[in-house]
Amino acid sequence: METSFFRFAQEGDIDKKTLVSTCALSILSAGFIYLILGYVFRQDLANAFETPDQVNYLVIFLFMLSIDAFATIPSAILRLEGKPVQYMLSKVIGALAYYFLVVFFIKWLPNYPNGILGIKYDPEIGVGYVFIANLVQSIITLAIVGKEFVNFSFKKFDFNLWKRIMNYSWPVMIAGLAGIINQTLDRQFLKFGLPKEEAKHQIGVYGAVYKIATFITVFRQAYQLGIEPYFFSSFKDKNNHKTYAVLMDVFVICNCLIYIGLMVNLQWIAERYLGNSQYFEGIEIIPLVMLGALFLGIYLNLSIWYKLSDQTRVGLYISLIGAAITIFINFAFIPKYGYWASAFAALITYTSMMIISYFWGRAQYPIHYNIKKILIYLSLSIAISLVSFLYFRENYFIGNGLFLLFIAFLAYNERTMINKILRKN
């Protein structure tokens, strides 16, 4: 719905209050329906997830997701109006509250048998305290951004506008569900495709190594949060295609730097982030996992063409193709290769989606990306990373030396863009 909000916010003939009210009422209605149905069938859902004794956790999770959904439109308004301070404030305060509550419930409270401020630690809740902290974080975030609902009015709901929005957004929503399949279904295949104890071990290893890839994921999410409103606000500019190409260059460069920086220092980073020494066997698949995350980011940047041209069904088709690839590879190869199959499935899926989106977009909504330069940067990044990983894994001097050479190459090759940025500042 955020994407739809940004898209229709650029149409000058649509009243802002009408747009906000239509989008907000749609999300509020869907959120409450989701919450009610989830609560009514909570036990059935818990049984389906094979956690029949954790219904309370599921209920907290339902409330958390609903509240997060309610916060999307006011958060989108802040992003659209160029209010990064208020937006980041809501995220930072929420994150700090979450961190404090986790430390309070898990670290401090168990040390005080008589409780703190009348609150006593209940060992039966256990990990449930993390869910409670998440719920509080969601409530705080909504409370901070909620003032943006000032433009909301039931009377301003426009059914015809709602139909246009839904026609644009439903493929995006289904594509989002397919994307969730691409990112999470591999754990389920590991769970059901391997013997129970082996599955538990491999899921632990696979989940642990994904922590390293979150460095790329966090950057991608931060980039998208900032850049998506700009894509829509500038799509009528005569030089917008040139700008989109430059932004892709910047995105790829930043991701290449993150990728190489992680890879040449992977050994000591893994020692700090993987935790359990049993998970160290999974370090071998980290290059694949991170490269898949990088290609997913490029795909999401490429996807702007079908959003700007109102061809959102293309995103649905590409996501379904990706989901089919994910399901096939995991189903066919996990019994023999375990999490290696999942890692390759993710890489092949995101590579395929990236390539399909590029060629489809070139035919329908041409944006002249600097493909040759991007391929050179990606190839050098992969080559440097693999050389360091395979031959100099614990020789940080050589690995980081290669990293610095790559940075020097980038600085020289991008000197014109760097000079423009420096002159502006």
Set out the residue ranges of the language-model regions.
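Hydrophobic alpha-helical transmembrane segments
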Residues: 88-150, 321-325, 339-360, 400-404
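Alpha-helical transmembrane segments of multi-pass membrane proteins
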Residues: 28, 32-36, 49-74, 131-132, ...
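Membrane-interface junctions at transmembrane-helix termini in multi-pass inner-membrane proteins
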Residues: 7-11, 67-91, 149, 153, ...
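Membrane-proximal transmembrane or re-entrant/amphipathic helices at the cytosolic face
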Residues: 388-425
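Interfacial/gating helices of multi-pass transporter permease domains
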Residues: 55-56, 123-129, 164-168, 172, ...
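Specific pore-lining/lateral-gate transmembrane helices of multi-pass inner-membrane transport
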Residues: 9-24, 205-319
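Interhelical loop/hinge segments that connect adjacent transmembrane helices in multipass membrane
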Residues: 112-129, 142-183, 226, 230-242, ...
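Membrane-water interface segments that mark the loop-to-transmembrane alpha-helix transition
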Residues: 1-43, 52, 56-59, 65, ...
